[in-house]
Regions:
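Glycine- and acidic-residue-biased ligand/ion/polar-headgroup-sensing regions
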Residues: 25-45, 64-70, 75-78, 84-86, ...
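Short, compositionally biased P/S/T/A/G/V-rich stretches that sit at domain boundaries
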Residues: 113-163, 238-246
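Conserved aromatic anchor
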Residues: 164-172
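Surface-exposed, short loops/turns at beta-strand junctions within beta-sandwich domains
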Residues: 203-211
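Alpha-helical linker/edge segments of TPR/alpha-solenoid repeat scaffolds
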Residues: 294-302
Length: 302
């Protein structure tokens, strides 16, 4: 059995709390993600599958099997990941958690309920295939790579120094150049990758002090994207609202951050954390579904 704990600030803490059995006030945990065989022994002794959004109460038992995974959100803001075969009394899981801070915002709760419900209502929707189809249309109509950012008169506001640029891959391309310029078209940074995304550390690139810049992606086959404008957020209070202990090792933790940034319109930061969640736990389908749903819902690339 392996258990990982992380402490979140209150604004992030309640994102998935109300997505199932919202009327129940005595739950201790909500199920965020499940992989493999995970069951719950209820208060009446009945055993049922653990599903995303399920409420865990004090008298229940969480039953995990070999190679299983479940991410749990405690009602006051802690995220716990449980792995391996064991029976866990819910009350004992609570005792393993550090003290969490309290306080919620109605806006964020409503946003979280809406997001989780949208994904759960139509789980068969293949967001990734829809995105690929959209990329084909983009290429056919405009001869362009589809970068997952906002275009036209909208800036892509970001907060953190590590920025992820992602695009939908070209069928015949083997590599891509990511080029950053200033508003006068002077090149500030360039890198080459064989992936369909690139995380750029602005400090290491020497451009952390530049508040606004332009980015484009060029394939080795000569196909280019549009120019996209990125601009740093001037909200210095964000760091105080995020989380206390972020190690980048917990997929549940990354999703919480993604939702936190998405709710604030910081889509560049949100996309990075959705991507990292999917990479940390590639076998847990809901993390990649949440990422693709986010891209589709926020119309990134348009």
């Amino acid at each position: 059995m392996g258990i990982t704990r992380r402490l979140f600030m209150p604004l992030v803490a309640v994102m998935v709390i109300c997505c199932h059995d919202c009327g129940a006030q005595d739950f201790l945990f909500k199920v965020m993600a499940v992989h493999g065989r995970v069951e719950v022994k209820g208060l009446d002794g009945a055993v049922m599958p653990a599903k995303v959004g399920f409420s865990l109460q004090e008298g229940m038992t969480l039953i995990t099997s070999e190679n299983s995974y479940v991410a749990l959100l405690y009602k006051t803001g802690n995220v716990m990941e449980v792995k391996g075969r064991a029976n866990h009394l819910v009350r004992d899981l609570v005792e393993k958690l550090p003290q969490a801070k309290t306080g919620v915002t109605t806006r964020l709760v409503n946003f979280a309920i809406s997001r989780i419900n949208e994904v759960n209502e139509d789980p068969e929707t293949n967001y990734k295939e829809n995105l690929r189809a959209a990329a084909g249309v983009e290429r056919a109509l405009n001869g362009e790579i589809k970068v997952l950012l906002k275009y036209q008169d909208k800036s892509n506001i970001f907060y953190e120094n590590q920025v992820m640029i992602e695009w939908l891959p070209e069928e015949k391309a083997d590599s891509y150049e990511v080029v950053i310029t200033d508003v006068f078209s002077e090149e500030l940074y360039k890198t080459t990758t064989t992936n369909s995304f690139q995380i750029i550390d602005l400090e290491q690139a020497g451009i952390a002090d530049i508040r606004m810049f332009l980015v484009k992606v060029i394939s080795n086959t000569g196909i280019s994207s549009r120019l996209f404008r990125l601009e740093r957020s001037d909200d210095d209070s964000i760091n105080e609202q995020i989380l206390v202990d972020h190690t980048g090792k917990s997929a549940g933790e990354e999703v919480m951050l993604a939702l936190f940034f998405e709710e604030r319109g910081l889509y560049v930061d949100a996309l990075k954390y959705y991507q990292q969640a999917a990479q940390i736990s590639p076998d847990v389908n809901i993390y990649s579904v949440l990422k693709d749903h986010f891209i589709t819902t926020q119309e990134l690339g348009n």
